[in-house]
A protein has these predicted regions:
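Aromatic-rich peripheral "rim/lid" segments of glycoside hydrolase catalytic domains that contact
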Residues: 66-73, 224-247, 252, 339-343, ...
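Boundary/entry segment of secreted carbohydrate-active catalytic domains
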Residues: 32-91
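Short, acidic/polar
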Residues: 62-86, 187-197, 296-311, 386-393
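Acidic-and-aromatic substrate-binding clefts and catalytic sites of carbohydrate-active enzymes
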Residues: 55-78, 98-123, 148-151, 215-218, ...
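Substrate-binding cleft and catalytic face of glycoside hydrolase catalytic domains
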Residues: 87-256, 263-279, 283-286, 362-364, ...
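Glycoside hydrolase catalytic-domain groove-lining segments
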Residues: 81, 142, 258, 269-287, ...
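Hydrophobic faces of well-ordered beta-strands that scaffold small-molecule active sites
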Residues: 50-60, 93-95, 139-143, 206-210, ...
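N-terminal Sec-pathway targeting helices
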Residues: 2-21
Length: 439
């Protein structure tokens, strides 16, 4: 009996090892096999979105004494900087929105330092929407449904205690105690409230993005968080973010993604109701959600968006983050990017919007010291940065990509990723900013 048990364990281990080896070989092989044979870009009527915009950090920079220049012109306000981006061909502004409502005196959340504590608040978002209305440029809201921040590495549940009418819908329960149906009641009401407040500033919203790098969760139903929707999520270790997309994406589909789809759909429904109540035409309003690609294979990315559709979330665009210099599944980041776009086009029937993109013009350090991968043909120089930016746009325009947002172009703490180099809080444009994005 003991021998049989040992044999079964050995067989299981051998089988598991074989499966892992096959997956690894498949990934390694796929890195060097790139072909467009049989590929057709998805058909879309959407105009290409040159989404260069002031970032969530720009207002803080000006408050802290930062200035910029371009071709001899001095720039001392967020409005003038956005005007520069419009002159360079930008077709929309951007705003990231957390559920935290007001700016507080310290960057602290739950007793810990939080650099996102005071850059994504509702109040700050409304000010950017007012600026978009003044400049007569559409704005793309990113609705995180997280208290201060979320991305592929970190998720937070939303908090609505600063919104009495929304908080009352929780009926005295903590967010982690709510069922999926109870969560969606609140999310729908929040979507409606938020959209009404934004649209009443007079701005135009043609595209709504729900979630930020939502690979592993949204609105509290997330890997590592306690939730009554799926109690097993709370005990999942962080390293599973790097294993599940590779070895077991079906686990993500069955334990996170299918629930998130219902949450996204609730927010979407609330947003569209706001258009109806305000008498604003919603015919051309579009929705997207974006995920990080560095932890995904092209096939896993396509499975994510198909899971959303299968479970009731209708989106018009698949959003992705693309950081070529970051560690990723592929040695050649451009091959990963291109194969991901083509997989989403072919398997999901969706165009792709690159919601976050940047490339370093020099060595990265500090928190981003690991983001120094050099892509072949694109050295980490100003020229290499500019060429990468241009080539991503040019390839994308013929391959089902309907827009690119250069992320945080004016943010000094982004290291060499930005499109300005800084001297004593003064931003001087790099080569990449000299390009005319309108051409």
């Amino acid at each position: 009996m003991k021998m049989k048990k040992i044999s079964k364990v050995k067989i299981a281990l051998i089988t598991l090892t074989a499966i892992v080896a096959l997956v690894v070989v498949k990934i390694l092989t796929a890195q060097f096999l790139y072909t467009e044979r049989g590929y057709s870009p998805v058909e879309t009527q959407q105009e290409f979105r040159n989404a260069l915009s002031v970032s969530p950090f720009t207002a803080t920079a000006f408050n802290n004494g930062y200035t910029y220049e371009y071709e001899g012109k001095q720039i001392g306000s967020i409005e003038d900087l956005e005007k520069l981006y419009i002159e360079k061909g930008a077709t929309e502004m951007y705003v990231r929105i957390a559920t935290k409502r007001h700016v507080t005196s310290e960057d602290i959340t739950d007793g810990e330092i939080d650099t996102n504590a005071n850059v994504h608040t509702f109040d700050q978002a409304i000010e950017l929407c007012k600026l978009a209305a003044k400049l007569n440029i559409p704005i793309n809201p990113e609705v995180m449904c997280a208290y201060t921040y979320m991305d592929m590495e970190k998720q937070q549940a939303p908090r609505f205690d600063e919104y009495p009418e929304l908080y009352a819908l929780q009926n005295g329960k903590e967010w982690s105690e709510l069922s999926l149906e109870e969560i969606n009641v609140v999310l729908k009401a929040y979507g409606k409230f938020l959209a009404k407040e934004i649209l009443q500033t007079g701005c135009t919203v043609e595209n709504w993005n729900l979630g930020n790098e939502a690979n592993f969760g949204f609105a509290g139903v997330s890997l590592g968080l306690e939730t009554a929707v799926n109690p097993k999520l709370a005990n999942q270790p962080d390293f599973m973010r790097y294993l599940l997309p590779l070895f077991n994406p079906s686990w993500l589909e069955n334990n996170i993604w299918k629930y998130n789809a219902k949450e996204f759909a609730a927010v979407r429904e609330g947003i569209l109701e706001a258009y109806d109540e305000l008498g604003i035409d919603k015919t051309n309003v579009k929705f997207s959600t974006h995920i990080a690609t560095v932890v995904m294979t092209p096939g896993a990315s396509a499975r994510y968006f198909n899971c959303m559709k299968k479970n009731g979330y209708t989106m018009d665009t698949a959003g992705i983050s693309f950081y070529p210099s970051a560690p990723s599944m592929y040695a050649d980041s451009m091959i990963l990017f291109k194969k991901t776009v083509m997989a989403i086009n072919n398997k999901c029937g969706l165009p792709v919007f690159v919601g976050e993109f940047s490339y370093p013009s020099g060595e990265m350090s500090g928190a981003f010291a690991g983001w120094n991968k050099v892509v072949k043909g694109y050295p980490n120089t100003e020229e290499g940065q500019a060429n990468m930016f241009r080539d991503v746009i040019d390839w994308g325009k013929t391959h089902g990509v309907i827009g690119v947002r250069y992320w945080a172009a004016d943010y000094e703490d982004w290291g060499t990723m930005g499109l300005f180099r800084f001297e004593n809080k003064h931003g001087i444009p790099k080569t990449g900013l000299a390009m005319d994005l309108g051409k």
